Amino acid sequence: EEPDMILFTGDLVNNQASEVEPYLDTLRQLHASDGIYSIWGNHDYCEYGNNHSIGALKRNRRMLYGYQESLGWHQLMNEHHVVSHGMASIAVIGVENPGQPPFTNRSNLKKAMKGLNPDMFKILLSHDPHHWRREVVGKKIQLTLAGHTHAGQLKIGKWTPARMAFKEWGGAYRIGEQMLY
């Protein structure tokens, strides 16, 4: 396949940045003509390991940022990138993890959208699907892509424990002209 764009919604690692090292050669094989865009999920901030010192957290975050940078990924940290082909343009917007307690809310959607044409087609990368109803619905963002729920890790038929914690836990959801997937 030759994708135009690859969009990644976070949780590249679980506890520490070094977990990605065995997969770097595989990840280097990913290519997309219009780029690979990434946001960070709650695990990417490396707050779940045994060493919670400020130094260890900063070191892990720098390492993870560096790994993704070395792969050529565009890490969208409350910012956007416009992809244009002729007269058509799409804005890829990325926010940092918009967590709900116990997770830290690091997102700043207003900052991420600053300067965008309101009529442009927009794709938002937002790790936590709660963010969609909480802040995105009603704004001119046509498509939001989220992760976080891990719904595919345990599913029996159509039942998953993710349904108890998330109204939107997997698949496509629509309100008016806006969609979450």
Regions picked out by a protein language model, each given a short descriptive name:
Residues 1-181:
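Soluble catalytic domains of enzymes that build or remodel membrane lipids, polysaccharides, and related
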